[in-house]
Structure formats: C-alpha cells, structure tokens
C-alpha cells in the first residue's frame, strides 16, 4: 500500500472560443511541446469544417462524437490463485472521456500517416466518422466491448 497521498485533480480552464472544458481537454491531448496555439488552430479548424459539412453546431457534433466513442465497459487484469483473469468492469465517467479523446486523436493520427492530407482534415473526418458511429475510434470502443463480452464469465471477480 502506498504511503503517498492521492494526487488532486487539476482544474482545467475552459477553451476560449466555445467555453467548453471537454474541448480544452481535447486541445490538451492534441497539443505537443506546449504549442497550444497550433493545437487550437487544428481543433477549431476541424470543428469548422465538420460544421460546414453537416450544418449542425460544432459543439453538438463534438459532444455526439465523444458520446459515441466513450466506452461503458472495459477489462482489467486481476490475479487470483496464481491465474490472471481479464475481469470486465464499468468505466468511470472521467476515464471514459479520457479514453474517447485519446482514441479520436490516435485514429486521426493513424489516418494522417496513411494519407497525404493535413492533420486538420484527418481530425475532421475522424470526428464525422465517430459522429456516424464508424471509424477508427469507434472500432477501438467496439474492441473493448468484445473483450468485456468474451470475459463475462469472470465478472464475479470484480474489484471492490
């Protein structure tokens, strides 16, 4: 058991354009080497393109895409009697949001490597794919669900 105290959650200030904490967290995920202005340009540009394509509000598109990608279940390793089981557990809200943001970022980055498009376009495409329940990020969520479903027999080993 650790003797250190649990680290307190940092309060993230909302982004300047849409006044959203979730969008500020997404900008933080995309940001590299402290270049916040570049990350903001990429995210805002992708949201503007998505808004122009669908004709809906940028924040409603972002929130819907995020809700479609957020996982409800995942598997955690639990060692019992010398055997390690993959135990399905429910995902807490904060972790679900963090996973969804990371998955959207990773899927857009993978698409960027495959094509010659700008990252802004790849991020826009990935947000629209997640909005329509398709794409790389949604596939990652479905893989989590398949793992949880396959190991449903071990759900009685849940964590306390």
Curated annotation (Swiss-Prot):
Coiled coil: none annotated. Gene3D superfamilies: Ribosomal protein S7 domain (1.10.455.10). InterPro entries: Ribosomal_uS7, Ribosomal_uS7_bac/org-type, Ribosomal_uS7_dom, Ribosomal_uS7_dom_sf. The keyword GTP-binding does not apply. SUPFAM superfamilies: Ribosomal protein S7. Keywords: Ribonucleoprotein, Ribosomal protein, RNA-binding, rRNA-binding, tRNA-binding. Belongs to the universal ribosomal protein uS7 family. This is Small ribosomal subunit protein uS7. It comes from Ehrlichia canis (strain Jake).
């Amino acid at each position: 058991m650790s003797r250190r105290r649990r680290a307190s959650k940092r309060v993230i200030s909302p982004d300047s354009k849409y006044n959203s904490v979730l969008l500020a967290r997404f900008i933080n995920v995309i940001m590299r080497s402290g270049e916040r202005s570049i990350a903001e340009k990429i995210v805002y540009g992708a949201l503007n393109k998505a808004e122009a394509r669908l004709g809906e509000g940028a924040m409603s598109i972002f929130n819907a895409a995020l809700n479609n990608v957020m996982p409800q279940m995942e598997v955690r390793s639990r060692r019992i009697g010398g055997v390690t089981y993959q135990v399905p557990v429910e995902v807490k809200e904060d972790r679900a949001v963090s996973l969804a943001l990371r998955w959207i970022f990773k899927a857009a980055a993978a698409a960027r490597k495959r094509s010659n498009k700008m990252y802004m376009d790849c991020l826009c495409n990935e947000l629209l794919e997640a909005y329509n329940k398709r794409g790389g990020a949604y596939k990652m969520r479905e893989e989590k669900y398949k793992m949880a479903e396959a190991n449903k027999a071990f759900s009685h080993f849940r964590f306390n």
